[in-house]
Amino acid sequence: MPTTHSRVALISGASRPLGLGFAVARHLAERDHHVILAARNVAQGEELAEALRSDGLVASAFALDLADQASVQRLSVELSGMVDHLDVLINNASAMPDFTSRSALDVDMDSLHTLFQTNVFGCWSLTLALLPLLRQAPAARIVNVTSAAAWQIGKRTPGLLFSPAYSLAKFTLNALTVTLAAALADSPILVNAVDPGSVASHPERGDDKDDRSPSEAAAGVVWAATLGADGPTGGFFQDGAPLPAPTL
């Protein structure tokens, strides 16, 4: 049954209670959005959707594997049966790098393919699959969640975990952001990339004490997701402040 909720937002990679995706979903749900949690583990996504519903918010969960084009298309079809428009798309799903690879000379090719499939190709594919619904919204917003790693191309910063494959994938995601923004320049759709900063979403891994909470990190993503008609497009931001374009 189509939703009667006026604003709809889909967040990919939203299946962990301490993850950025769920924090963004809660923020948007509290701003009167019907939030769609899309994740490979739909059971976990449904648990989180139920947690939101128990708080009086509107939420649903769908299965999504960005490495599987059939899964992307299936989500598009199923979502079209529930809603007639999509106001916000948060491309949050991300494959994590192998941090043991510190040089472009020893990158594992399987890991590289996984990183690009999720962080770039899957994001692109999902955006195109949902574009018809995005065009039906009065002024849709697309937010690509990037990383400080995109600004580390070719650098070896002391004390910073460095993965050339991950940096290159996020750098490419930033380039995709600019490309999509240009392609949609004649529409009311705004496309931006947001770096949420270092997020304490994996306490079991010993996150740094200075990492931001998921809720704190989500604020900048929500800012980009709720920009007004005169908002920027094709830019890079953190906490609503512009970041310089990554350079080679």
PLM features per residue range, with description:
Residues 4-5, 57-58, 78-91, 97-100, ...:
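A glycine-rich helix->loop->beta "capping" turn
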Residues 42, 62-77:
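The beta1-alpha1 cofactor-binding region of Rossmann-like NAD(H)/NADP(H)-dependent oxidoreductases
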Residues 90, 126-130, 134, 176-177, ...:
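Hydrophobic positions on the long internal alpha-helix
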Residues 2-36:
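Canonical Rossmann dinucleotide-binding motif of NAD(H)/NADP(H)-dependent dehydrogenases/reductases
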Residues 186-187, 193-194, 201, 205-248:
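C-terminal helical subdomain
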Residues 31-47:
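Conserved glycine-rich Rossmann-like NAD(P)H-binding loop of the short-chain dehydrogenase/reductase
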Residues 13, 17, 95-97, 102-116, ...:
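Catalytic loop of short-chain dehydrogenase/reductase
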